Amino acid sequence: MTILIQQYTNDENKKLELNNISKLLQNRIILFSQTVDDEICNSIVGQLLYLENEDSTKDIRLFINSPGGSVTAGLSVYDTIQNLSVDVSTICFGLAASMGAVLLAAGVENKRFAFASSRIMIHQPLSKVEAPWSHLDIQIRNGAYFKNLLNNILSFHTKQELKQIETDTERDFFLSATEAKQYGIIDHIFINNN
């Protein structure tokens, strides 16, 4: 997890990258721009906790461009956002799909944004079952648990009826920024200033 500015390195490009990330953190901005997995989510959770500890009165801005990924890893970020004493504003640039869309919706109400050309996609969780036949029922119940949990999370944050969420997440459900605002995933759209 990169939080502090690296002072010495043999690679000038790496030093510049670390300094840019540190500059963002100094401005209370976290960049989530990859697949949701344990490594990135551990880093994001660490950055959220670090920024809350630095100043518990200022908002944190979480910029999201993610195709989604691990549900359990994403839920660690979700739970952290929900339990911080500071407001987390979420901003979609590019794509917020699957778990990325759940994290986008998890921002504080009236502080969830998307850029005008962003795409948001929700669906039911994917499952890759690798278990003996005798354990398949356990895996199926676990998958159903996460499907129900994510649908309830989306229903809570969007104010959509649970039945509507269940219907919409049966397949990939893509939304433009405008549609995501109408749906309740975001509250505001950044319009291009041309």
UniProtKB/Swiss-Prot annotation:
Keyword field contains Chaperone: no
Membrane-spanning segments: none
Known EC number: 3.4.21.92
Catalytic residues of the enzyme: S98, H123
Reactions that this protein is recorded to catalyse: Hydrolysis of proteins to small peptides in the presence of ATP and magnesium. alpha-casein is the usual test substrate. In the absence of ATP, only oligopeptides shorter than five residues are hydrolyzed (such as succinyl-Leu-Tyr-|-NHMec, and Leu-Tyr-Leu-|-Tyr-Trp, in which cleavage of the -Tyr-|-Leu- and -Tyr-|-Trp bonds also occurs)
One MF annotation (Gene Ontology) recorded for this entry: ATPase binding
Top-rank taxon: Eukaryota
PROSITE patterns on file: CLP_PROTEASE_HIS, CLP_PROTEASE_SER
Keyword RNA-binding: no
Pfam family of the protein (one): CLP_protease
Principal subcellular localization: plastid
Family in the record: Belongs to the peptidase S14 family.
PANTHER family: ATP-DEPENDENT CLP PROTEASE PROTEOLYTIC SUBUNIT (PTHR10381), ATP-DEPENDENT CLP PROTEASE PROTEOLYTIC SUBUNIT, MITOCHONDRIAL (PTHR10381:SF11)
Full protein name: ATP-dependent Clp protease proteolytic subunit
